[in-house]
């Protein structure tokens, strides 16, 4: 399993490295300058955390917000199906971690990425679209969050239909289902 995680990590690095060639278009930066690195899609990794969390770049803030919306949809679908969200197969099991939710999000991430990428390529941003926290993290202004939430309509029903299919498959293999059903 560790080898699979390593392959996934390398693939993600290559995937998001390709995003770095994409320019971002800005207006109003004469009055309110932005960091130089905001003119192109940056590294997926945050300089604050060394992970994808605590985004310091607008595109990462967009992705994090969109993934948060996806996580909510998948979590609702998992719980509604009567599955234990903490028992996953790819993401390691840790206290408080919803490993099954993260596992089931993986095949849906490309749809989120596509929506965000399409938005980034068509949108002209302004510095007011984002808010910098005292710690240096980049967050979405509420209006920008509304744009991202509108992208959610495209994926909202998908987690429920996929998890319904998984539940049917698990019912066909009762022993496997008993491993991941909530107690």
Positions of the model-derived regions?
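Active-site helix-to-loop segments that bind/position phosphate- or nucleotide-bearing substrates
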Residues: 1-183
